Amino acid sequence: HLTPEDVVILPAFGLTLQDFENLKKIGCILVDTTCGSVLVVWKRVEKYAKDGFTAVIHGKYTHEESRATASQVERHEGGKYIIVRDMEEGELLFDYIAKRPGHLSREAFMEHFANKASKGFDPDADLEYIGVANQTTMLAKESLAIGWKVHEAFVEHFGEEHASTHFRSFGTICSATQERQDAVADMMEDSPDVMLVIGGYNSSNTNHLAHLCRQHTATFHVEDAACINIDTGSVLHKP
């Protein structure tokens, strides 16, 4: 059990609003290392909730950062969010907004996004006003594409004038993440024979970099130097 004498270091991806409030109640000494880029996203999502906009968050709903970001809507009564993992899942959202032929029924939509949306989420009422944000370590191009597709669906169903007042978007990719993704893209213009990507197997950043590299050349994702055995000439890497 934590006590007021304990020192708690808040991670770079932040904590959910509820967890943060619980720590404050205990009176722990808090060392907040939440990344500045993450805080920017939080402020944007909170503003969406304040203005009555549902936050569409491009991210992994199981990731600590996405959960912390989504929780920021709770600062305002009635705040809503829905988390979309990738473009494939995004298509379910786009089709529902635009009411395209074959779109999911309300029940099927709710079932699919049951664990990825705010409590009491109603797709027929809560997709009238939308603001787009993202987990800061997602692929930048995909985040931008998802935002554009949401806007496109709005225009298709409601018209351009409606979209201009009911849709908001804001680029929230971490600058360091963007720089690394851009660097990989530049390197792949003259693809090397092999790429070695070093980082945690559970790191969203590192996994995205490895994914980008695999599209062009043989890629090995390793956690650290211990994964490379010089004597045997073998590499222990993520499949």
Regions from the language model: what does each represent?
Residues H1-P239:
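The feature marks the mature, well-folded catalytic cores of soluble enzymes
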